């Protein structure tokens, strides 16, 4: 009976009190967490912090990058608890204002009861994240390729139509002199025909 008390009942009570203790500690921390002061300090050190924060963000896992872009809700922070805890530790290393006390509090109470403070830090980190250039949509790329192909085909057709026209022009030029020769021969034959009738009356 004693062993059952120690292993089940006492352990359950300890967990209950421990959980309540963490909540109480988190509540006390949130009361003393001065957002205005931390926000002002971040603004003052913005130029100094930017390259350090960018480096930390770039080396962070995808879930943190997604969390920085989306709304920092308590459920999302809880879902990504281990990654958030690690990220806060990295921010504390570069002396990001507010990160160190929040990181220490998370180590004692967990991420869930401290989600308001964590969300505040993440919101302050978000503006430092470099914006990604929008990638062109696949449909737009396909349309551009189709258009370029159609233009190329049309140009090829025009070249093919223009090519036969040149030999035809050359043939016409070659035929022109022969036509002139025929006309000259006809003109020479006409005087001969006219002279023949004139000679006939002399014979009579």
UniProtKB/Swiss-Prot annotation:
Low complexity biased stretches: 164-180, 193-204
InterPro entries associated with the record: DREPP (IPR008469)
Region described as Disordered: 128-204
GO cellular component, one term: plasma membrane
Pfam families tied to this protein: DREPP
Basic and acidic residues: compositionally biased ranges: 147-161, 182-192
Similarity annotation: Belongs to the DREPP family.
Matches recorded under PANTHER family: PLASMA MEMBRANE-ASSOCIATED CATION-BINDING PROTEIN 1 (PTHR38522), SALT STRESS ROOT PROTEIN RS1 (PTHR38522:SF1)
The protein's name in its UniProt record: Salt stress root protein RS1
């Amino acid at each position: 009976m004693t062993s059952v008390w120690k292993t089940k009942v006492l352990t359950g009570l300890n967990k209950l009190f421990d959980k309540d203790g963490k909540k109480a500690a988190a509540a006390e921390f949130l009361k003393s967490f001065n957002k205005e002061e931390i926000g002002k300090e971040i603004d003052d050190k913005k130029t100094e912090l930017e390259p350090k924060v960018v480096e930390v963000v770039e080396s962070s896992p995808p879930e943190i990058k997604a969390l920085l872009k989306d709304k920092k809700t308590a459920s999302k922070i809880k879902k990504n608890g281990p990654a958030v805890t690690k990220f806060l530790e990295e921010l504390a290393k570069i002396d990001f204002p507010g990160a160190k006390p929040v990181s220490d509090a998370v180590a004692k109470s967990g991420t869930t009861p401290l989600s308001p403070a964590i969300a505040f830090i993440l919101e302050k980190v978000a503006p430092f994240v470099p914006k990604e250039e929008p990638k062109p949509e696949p449909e737009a790329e396909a349309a551009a390729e189709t258009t370029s192909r159609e233009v190329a085909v049309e140009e090829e057709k025009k070249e093919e139509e223009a090519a036969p026209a040149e030999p035809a022009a050359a043939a016409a030029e070659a035929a022109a002199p022969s036509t002139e020769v025929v006309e000259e021969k006809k003109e020479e034959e006409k005087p001969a025909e006219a002279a023949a009738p004139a000679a006939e009356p002399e014979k009579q």
